[in-house]
């Protein structure tokens, strides 16, 4: 709903008049930056989901998309026992996913590390998994996860994926990009 005078949302105008509930105090929120541990420069997918069967469903999605892929999945529960659920077909990648999931510490998030597959090969299947809410990143770049923390828990605010732009591509850069995509088989030669 919009007010008629200055087109600001009516609820924003009225919010200043609402008295706080008895005993209410604003929760302090701290935002921290968590560097994703990725010593081999593997592809990592970080996202948010909402249900305990996520780890198993993501396993099936990746396995069905790229059968030769090696991967590890860690999913942080947000209620009940609040465990990190683990699936995958490579022990080292499962361990890496768990270490990063614990470091991020945000409920209902998942971390997937991939070997012998690119995110572009599995993202559609991951997105089509019914419990997946969003994907924050899918990259092999260095990643920092921005995590908001209050007394109850943590949530991902966003990610810093890679580095800042250093300029705008030239015609030579464009030619290199087009050749690279054909070289790795993602565009017809």
Could you say what each language-model-derived stretch is?
Residues 51-52, 79-80, 90-91, 115-120, ...:
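Gly/Ser/Thr-rich loops at beta-strand to alpha-helix junctions
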Residues 78-102:
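Positively charged, polar, low-complexity stretches
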Residues 27-86, 171-189:
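N-terminal, charge-rich interaction modules
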Residues 100-106, 117-189:
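Helix-rich interaction surfaces within compact, conserved domain-sized segments
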